[in-house]
From Swiss-Prot:
Site (Interacts with Hha) residue list: 12
Annotated keywords: Coiled coil, Cytoplasm, DNA-binding, Repressor, Transcription, Transcription regulation
SMART domains: HNS
Protein name as catalogued: DNA-binding protein H-NS
Residues forming coiled coils: 22-55
Effect of residue 102 to A: No change in DNA-binding, in fragment 91-137
Pfam family for this entry, one: Histone_HNS
Domain notes: Composed of 2 domains (approximately residues 1-64 and 89-136) joined by a flexible linker. The isolated N-terminus (1-64) forms a trimer, probably via coiled-coil interactions. The isolated N-terminus plus linker fragment (residues 1-89) forms homooligomers of increasing size with increasing protein concentration, while the isolated C-terminus fragment is a monomer. A shorter fragment (residues 1-46) interacts with Hha.
Its biological purpose: Acts as a global transcriptional repressor and binds to the minor groove of AT-rich DNA. Silences genes by altering DNA topology; in magnesium concentrations equivalent to inside Salmonella-containing vacuoles (SCV) it forms rigid and elongated filaments on the DNA, and in higher magnesium conditions it causes DNA bridging/folding.
Localisation per UniProt entry: Cytoplasm, Nucleoid
Region listing for Responsible for protein oligomerization, in residue ranges: 2-64
Disruption phenotype: Loss of osmotic regulation of the proU locus, loss of changes in plasmid linking number. 2X decreased growth rate, which is partially restored by a mutation preventing expression of SPI2, increased expression of about half of the genes to which H-NS binds. Note strain LT2 has point mutation in rpoS which decreases its translation efficiency, in the presence of wild-type rpoS, deletion of hns is lethal. Leads to the expression of genes encoding virulence proteins in normally non-inducing conditions.
């Protein structure tokens, strides 16, 4: 709250300030204050009327949905599911190649991404082909 509003809100300070003004000035200030208060009341009532109208419309639409056999919660849930925007996770690709790493563990590779170092080394140094690592079904 600003200093001017604090002065207007405090009756003692207001009386002290009013002693320095003429009666005509005080009446003019009162008229202006009444105009401002009336404008504010009109704004508040207009805002309340808008909220009431919106609530009435929402209730009307809700009744229309129920009349058509649609549960409003079902509609909200379907809208939320469509709006979520999260992508569905892809299914993991099946392993296509199998190899034994330096620790003696059998590992698999889908064929996507970088070629594992063990397979790359075997292809370069031992002359193996990628088909040599295929998992036979």
């Amino acid at each position: 709250m600003s200093e001017a509003l604090k002065i207007l809100n405090n009756i003692r300070t207001l009386r002290a300030q009013a002693r320095e003004c003429t009666l005509e000035t005080l009446e003019e200030m009162l008229e202006k204050l009444e105009v401002v208060v009336n404008e504010r009341r009109e704004e508040e009532s207009a805002a309340a009327a808008e909220v009431e109208e919106r609530t009435r419309k929402l209730q009307q639409y809700r009744e229309m949905l129920i009349a058509d056999g649609i549960d409003p919660n079902e509609l909200l849930n379907s809208m939320a599911a469509a709006k979520s925007g999260t992508k569905a996770k892809r299914a993991a690709r099946p392993a296509k190649y199998s190899y034994v790493d330096e620790n003696g563990e059998t590992k698999t590779w889908t064929g996507q991404g970088r070629t594992p170092a063990v397979i790359k080394k075997a292809m370069e140094e031992q002359g193996k082909q990628l088909e040599d690592f295929l998992i036979k079904e």
